[in-house]
Amino acid sequence: MAAIALCASSAAPGADQPPICADRPGKATGTCIVPTGHWQIETGLADWSEQDGGGERDTSLAIGETTIKYGLTDRSNIEVDVAPWQRATSHFAGAHESDSGFGDINVLFKQLLTSAAAPWQVAALPLVKIPTASHSLGNGKWEGGLLIPIGYSIPKTKLGIGLTPEIDWAADADGAGHHAAMAQVVSLGWAASEKLNLSAELWGAWDWDPAGTTRQASADGSVAYLLGNDVQLDAGANLGLNRVTPDVELYGGVSVRF
């Protein structure tokens, strides 16, 4: 979400390119495209979450989750998400179980659907999940989805709003087939200065597995800071709003364009 307000308001005069526009931080996805012929690396240095309930405490830690992007044209880029190391731990009845390893890989293609001058920016982002994670960290199934990022910079303000509806083709819990799932993010970003952006989000997800429907929700906040035109630092916190959502998630990362 940081991308909406920063890209709208902080381009330096005479800069060859506008400031880096990353999908980090937050759960919303921006409409911006990596410049043609450029690479962009968005890395989560650490991402930790915890969930308590039913006498069990579950924690997860991911180190180095990275999105690698390449600008194909001025309206499209390709992206690959990799999770080089994850650890999931469950604590219960004085004991615990833990597993760690490589996560799943996602391949995405982003296409901007509106002109650069349009007040509302809209993009399409189909994705495919490649099941590369170990069984305890993933479900071992191919999955897919489609995101439609929508962004709007409010005129004469330093505010931007964003929506990210998502529909997914998710594997059934029993591995017998697939079903529909969806998510939605509503975002508000504020460019506090030319380098600093603050954002708030509401996130919801619905998974209609034949074994039972799961609904999750969180209230999220994040901060992004431009170290330079091509480097951004970020941090954020997500707070679960129901029992099936992690109670708290904390993360920080860096994005670099070259």
Language-model segments: residues:
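Sec-dependent signal peptide recognition
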Residues: 1-3
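N-terminal signal peptide c-region/cleavage motif recognized by signal peptidases
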Residues: 8-10
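Transmembrane beta-barrel domains of Gram-negative outer membranes and organellar outer membranes
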Residues: 14-258
